[in-house]
Amino acid sequence: MKGLGSTIVRSLPNGARLVCADNTGAKELEIIAVKNYTGTVRRLPAGGVGHMVFVSVKKGTPEMRKQVLPAIIIRQKKEYKRADGTRVKFEDNAAVIVTPEGTPKGSEIKGPVSKEAAERWPGVSRLAKIIH
């Protein structure tokens, strides 16, 4: 896992619903925890593009539903600024289910993957068709 080059806005708090962008059988995910988050009193833990989160599968195949799994956020609606000054935002909030080490469980990723997530997680960048 590599550090992030740009300032990512942590716009997805606990309880946020994400689209599952891989072919593991999950359709909709809900964030229940953000890994390595150190916050302040009464503030909800939140994550952004490239962060690892723990999710609960809300919609999907019967085998996948109600499971708690690690995932990596690959897209977010809230715009964030890159080091070169450009601002990036996506159409939806999406994540990919991974193993605890960061290797994707699925064999394909649907839609674009942010450059920040691809740089930080090599396993995700291997499966990405579009890196934006």
Swiss-Prot record:
GO biological process: translation
GO terms for MF: large ribosomal subunit rRNA binding; structural constituent of ribosome
Keywords in alphabetical order: Ribonucleoprotein, Ribosomal protein, RNA-binding, rRNA-binding
Pfam family, one: Ribosomal_L14
Disulfide bond residue pairs: none
InterPro entries, sorted: Ribosomal_uL14, Ribosomal_uL14_arc, Ribosomal_uL14_CS, Ribosomal_uL14_sf
Family to which this protein belongs: Belongs to the universal ribosomal protein uL14 family.
Subunit-level organization: Part of the 50S ribosomal subunit. Forms a cluster with proteins L3 and L24e, part of which may contact the 16S rRNA in 2 intersubunit bridges.
Function: Binds to 23S rRNA. Forms part of two intersubunit bridges in the 70S ribosome.
Name the UniProt record assigns to this protein: Large ribosomal subunit protein uL14
Native organism: Methanococcus maripaludis (strain C7 / ATCC BAA-1331)
